[in-house]
């Protein structure tokens, strides 16, 4: 094709830039016509020497892209085929309640201007209502809507906000430091120096902002966290993140239930085991990589840095999109979610979910977090979901390829949320 081949790993991590470096002219033209809105919908490897992407341009044109991988793990050919139109993301998204608005807002936190969306009744005649801060997961890349670059717009925090509006609960969700309109702010020159303190500060500032709104009933405040956001929800509600208005209810939606680096280690070892079963790695190579991952975790916990020499690919385990900076990882790992949960004020109402289809962690691991909530004498509503993936969608498959599919949000979770709000907020 007249261009040097690009490693498959680079295509995966930096999809838009690396893909377009080798894309056919017709696809480049389509991308440019789409005002630069190239999105990765799914990625699969049907066999070890083939990577298949499905991508869209501006949500309209969809392409299936086959990228054969040579013996050195490099891509030297591209086959792209346009696909038929698919459903719009809006078709699976709960709608905002009539008479409610989603208002863009800003607030300050730690010297950074945070951009967010305040969802509330459009008329002051509605009086005061309960209100909740919504915290997303996945480090610095997930924005106020629960979306990340290079992925299908899942909009899971939009779904939660719209569900809350239907139940008469206002909400504030925001672009965390490093994401969306907020960006890196004063950390732009050195994002790796941010650590977790800015994320704690913005959670506290968000709750204070919400409590100041004229339509907010300050006696009925809540915080909901998804995935890694669950840790910050616990830090906020317990007061460990900083002084903030008292929270009456906490929602932990498929939260990280154990120390974060333990979770990274477990998921990495599971991936290596699967690769051996599929014939992609030898048992000896997988064992060597597993030992390197264990060394890397020990180093992060001891020094906050990775060892100088690691096998190819292991460092990327801790630097990939959605993981946060190394400093943030090492700092958030200090918190055992169960230990933080045990510090919640007694009788705090807590909605906790786990699912048999969450392939990040199972209900047995979430039981560890539940034990901490029990120790705190929380009013715990522990809901075991059936066939719901990590991103709150109906999907029993545990297939990561489906994370970027347009699937409906969980009706079980919606029912559990409605019941919890009616009883506790």
Predicted segments — roles?
Residues 359-365:
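Conserved alpha/beta-hydrolase "acid-adjacent" motif
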Residues 388-392, 396-425:
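Catalytic active-site module of serine/aspartate enzymes centered on a nucleophile-bearing elbow/loop
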Residues 344, 351-354:
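Short beta-strand/loop motif that positions the catalytic acidic residue
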Residues 156, 192-213:
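Alpha/beta-hydrolase active-site loop
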Residues 85-127:
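N-terminal cap/lid segment of alpha/beta-hydrolase-fold proteins
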Residues 251-343:
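Accessory cap/linker subdomain of secreted extracellular hydrolases
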Residues 205, 209-274:
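Primarily recognizes the serine-hydrolase "nucleophile elbow" in alpha/beta-hydrolase
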Residues 124-164:
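Short, surface-exposed "cap/lid" segments of acyl-processing enzymes
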